[in-house]
Amino acid sequence: EPPKDFFIDKLKWKFLVRNIEKGKNIMMTGPSGCGKTDATFKAANYLEREVHYFNLGATQDPRSTLIGNTHYNKDSGTYFSESLFVSAIQQENAVILLDELSRAHPEAWNILMTVLDPIQRYLRLDEKDDSPTIKVAKGVSFIATANVGMEYTATRVIDRAILDRFSLIEMDVLSEDDEYTLLKGKFPTIDENTLLQLCSIVGDIRKEINTDSPRLSTMISTRNTIEIAELIMDGFSIQDAAELL
């Protein structure tokens, strides 16, 4: 069963937990703020596995993030320092979260090819003398996230060879009923009618975005809805809170 404070389809939750337990790779797709990253942390916590987080969409230097750097010291000369990623993949049963893989530089995909391959499972440290290979430890699971939707202009088309190394879980935005239940649990002091009105407005915006000719272009995520509710708690009206976000 999924955690009570987290809304996810039971079958998808079971599949996610099963893949982490067996050290298999999962790609979580869906709009920003729909719970992809949260689901990974909650599933890992459920299994008592450590999560190592790497935001590949934010790095402009994938070699430094995934392999390491060569440095020069005037006393000892040139030396190589391994990245945190190198040490993370050597920890048994670790969960490696590759956030925003869809925004990563293609060089990151090239580096990850052998790492994610279910048979090869190694990383070559080609920046280091003799280019040693690091084997991925037993039970390590790689969870990637990818945002989808027309508002994600920085998103790249992921290489087919990379996609084939993952099983897919599509995460959806919450229904109005589920979102209301979530907000009611998080903000029990907010008036019920206010929460219902908020969920209705958000639901109408999402429906508009999913039409053939939407007048709006930016999806309101569950994360955004929670932020609006926080502002309402602090005395903002629904309209003012929505405008600020």
Q: Predicted regions span which residues?
A:
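Alpha-helical lid/collar subdomain of P-loop NTPases
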Residues: 1-6, 22, 175-245
